[in-house]
């Protein structure tokens, strides 16, 4: 049996580091009651391991949630465009944790008006990750 490590922490750190360095909307791991909008927050992460016996490959789906208090879609669309540009123009760096990113792409984006004021959105990022130590 092969040792298996989950790249959850490495993935979240790589996304946080890249987005913090390359765009201006604040990124939060947890959104408290006093958080100021607009902001980006980590949402759901799903991960599956490939059935290959000789290579540890993971398929991760990470959701980034975007919140805006502006009553037009222009702010949220601009933030989504910035995030999409960053995540498709630069490769996530997970090498220090012993993982390599084989592929990354945005698979879905959804925007919705909020009940009270503003808009929220979800951007889904799919990442194929190889465990270089496994």
How should these model regions be labeled?
Residues 36-37, 51:
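Short acidic/glycine-rich loop or secondary-structure boundary segments that cap or lie
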Residues 37-45:
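A short, hydrophobic beta-strand-centered structural micro-motif
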Residues 32-34:
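Short, glycine-/polar-rich solvent-exposed loops and beta-turns at beta-strand/coil boundaries
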Residues 1-30, 44-134:
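Charged, amphipathic alpha-helical segments and their flanking helix caps
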């Amino acid at each position: 049996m092969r040792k298996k490590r989950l790249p959850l922490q490495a993935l979240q750190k790589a996304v946080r580091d890249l987005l913090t360095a390359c765009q201006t909307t604040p990124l939060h791991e947890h959104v408290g009651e006093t958080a100021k909008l607009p902001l980006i927050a980590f949402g759901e992460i799903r991960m599956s391991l490939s059935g290959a016996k000789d290579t540890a490959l993971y398929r991760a789906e990470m959701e980034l949630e975007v919140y805006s208090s502006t009553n037009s879609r222009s702010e949220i669309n601009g933030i989504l465009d910035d995030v999409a540009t960053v995540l498709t123009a630069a490769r996530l760096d997970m090498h220090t944790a012993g993982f390599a990113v084989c592929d990354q792409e945005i698979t879905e984006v959804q925007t919705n008006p909020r009940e009270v004021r503003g808009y929220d959105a979800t951007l889904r990022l799919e990442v194929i990750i190889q465990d270089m130590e496994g």
